[in-house]
Amino acid sequence: MIGKGSVNHNTRAFTAKNVDKNRSADNVEFCQEDIKQVYHKLFDEARERYNAKQKRKDRMIDNYYEKIRRGKQEKLFHEVIFQIGNKDDMNAKNEDGLLAKRILTEFMDEFQARNPNLYVFSAHLHMDEETPHLHIDFVPYITGSKRGLDTRVSLKSALAAEGFAGG
């Protein structure tokens, strides 16, 4: 499932009605970074190289995060949710739910290594809802681009670098 992404839901800063607060302690936070800091880490050097080449001031980029946020080409980040089974066959309250937790934890432990062009800045396993599920928020990016910033946000190119074809 691909969604808009709600970091507040994932970190439980906001708690939905279907959450069992007594089981929230069983949730797993794999990572949680501030997205603006992630953008600085990933793109500041590329932005500086890009700006150094510009002859026109109006083409310079002051803040790449804001450029992407205001633009229509790319999204700031993407979220995917992984779940095994449903509330009937993998309920978080029983042994099958614990099996799902182990599988999803192992999956997450290897996700970044398998997907080097998807920078994971937030990942949370929820055990306090009916079915265990994993939220992964990531910034898709590429390096070595010939146009614009040499390191930039691009879901299509990041997935192509991972071997996925399509448009």
Predicted ranges, named:
Residues 1-167:
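N-terminal nicking endonuclease/strand-transfer module with a His-rich metal-binding environment
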